[in-house]
Amino acid sequence: MVDIRKSLFFIIFFIFYNYVNSQKAINSDAFCQKKTITSICDPYLFNTDSIYIFNSTTTQESIELEIKRLLGFFSMLPSTCQVPSTYRLICNQYFQTCVPISKTDNSSTIAIPLRPCRESCDYGNGICGTQSITPCTGTFTEPTIYKFPVTSNVFDLSSLGGPSNYDLQCLNIDTMKAGNLNGTYISNNETVIVNQTCVYPLVYRNSTNREDDIKKGYQYLTETSDCLLPCPVPFFTENEWYQFKDLTTVTGVISFVCIFFNIFIYGFLNKKHDRHTIGILCLSFSLWCCMLSDLIVASSPDYSLVCPEPGRFARIHDSRCVANGIIFQWGAVCTTMFWSAMAIDLYLVIKKLSLPAFTVKYFVAAIFTLALLFTTVPLAWDDYGYGFGGVGCWIMSNSVQNGCFWIPMLICLLIGAVSICLIIYEIVKVFKNVGRSGISIILANARLFGIVSFIFIEYIYLFVYHFWVQENTEKFTQNITDWVICVQTTGSSDGCPLPKAVPYATQFIFLFFLRLLGIEVCIFYGINSRSKNIILESDLVNNKYFKAIRSKISSVGATSTTKNNTSTNNTSDQFNTSMFSVEVSKNGGDDDDL
């Protein structure tokens, strides 16, 4: 839940009490005025025939604007707050009834405001949950005049030519009575001001079980609000969100096919497994699982996988989301670990060191076991779901995500970094000790060193990206809060800038790098001389059916070659004969000349 409760209550406090505090207890510039505009408060006002205007710069229109600003936040407050008594309190605090008091010489009148009673203020705080930040006990500079009187305020108007001890009873919001004062209020005219809706793109939900809704992934603005955040959160425009999804779908499918090519060669066609081929196969299978999770994302034309309903973020109860998260998590952990294993393997190759076969098997089993552990822990804690970013489901909480992925990744990065440094050291040593004759050793492993280094750079980017986002999470959350307040205040999202979060290009690169891994592994491990030899030595190429096809192709090629040779020979004979004739002719001519 994005809890904007504190910010929301602060805004309400600021608007409501700033208006109250902007008035003086007694203002010589104040005057009474008949209600001249149509207001949403009309049915709730005690007396529309006499409205208190506390200075010359204040108008009924400006008061109405302040009321609308305040009521714009009420859809985010509990439904218990959205009742007639609350509207009576607010409306009569803004459009206060004006009580004219005649001066002692009857030359003119002094305008003083009729204020709601403290009991009404306390009751409004109680049903709205604002009692901790909107006190009802304040006074003006005159300590005997209360902003919300207990029963009445006593005014000393002698400085303005009026009575020195005028007692004005407060307005009881429940009974809409104020001593012996008469008003225009009619109870059956009251209507609900705030409709049970939320400003688009916020989503309204009338909850019957809020706790259960939160578990299902409904993101309420506050603990008591009926408004939900839209899913996905508008950190980006709708078009940009779909660009991310298209990127994931296209590159994910391409990477899926590329990785399957590796699996087919090293898993199905390969007859002779060694440490190197087992490493490639395991790395490829791990990446294939990651890309399989992308196919689950691609299976939905929209964001329904992660946003099953408006305002609901997918959670552990959504089977497709959980499958997407589990498959990706297992594949991602395995990929990271096998990458570090491949870095170690490359160092061993350059050093010409070998490991016993059983060591490799135990190593692979250990990686799969650890990956399974890091995958089941979030499942046990119901932590798979969709957060505020990305296009698919994964681990939601930072603590679990760090413990089950990013910290293991950091360890793998350190292992990989040490291996890369050792490899570079060995390369330098070969150049120094062997000279140019050692270049062949380096060139033979250049592709492998390239892929290990490329993946290392990409992992560093992903690692830094994650912790940068994590470090700025509170800032991004505050940006959401500011955006919500803007939307509710203005009544539209058109004039409100999107909440700032991760830059578009940064997010795009992050998503792209995750899918680029599969294509890179295919290029570096799947397209080389070893994979070619595996294909040529496989049963696929050497079975009787393929041999028959190959022999036919060969016979067709041989026939074509024979014809070409015959044609070439004939052409050569003709050419030679012609040349011979020329030579004879030339020789004959010479004889004649002789």
From Swiss-Prot:
Top-level taxon of the source organism: Eukaryota
Keywords: Disulfide bond, Glycoprotein, Membrane, Receptor, Signal, Transmembrane, Transmembrane helix
Cysteine pairs bridged by disulfides in the record: 32-98, 41-91, 117-170
Compartments, record wording: Membrane
Residue ranges, Cytoplasmic side: 270-277, 351-361, 425-448, 529-594
Cytoplasm in keyword set: no
Keyword Hydrolase: no
GO CC annotations on file: membrane
Bilayer disposition of the protein: Multi-pass membrane protein
Residues linked to a glycan: 55, 106, 182, 189, 195, 206, 479
InterPro entries the UniProt entry points to: Frizzled_dom, Frizzled_dom_sf, GPCR_Fz/Smo-like
Membrane-spanning ranges: 249-269, 278-298, 330-350, 362-382, 404-424, 449-469, 508-528
Residue span(s) of domain FZ: 27-173
Region forming the signal peptide: 1-22
Membrane-side (Extracellular) residue stretches: 23-248, 299-329, 383-403, 470-507
Family: Belongs to the G-protein coupled receptor Fz/Smo family.
Protein name: Frizzled and smoothened-like protein A
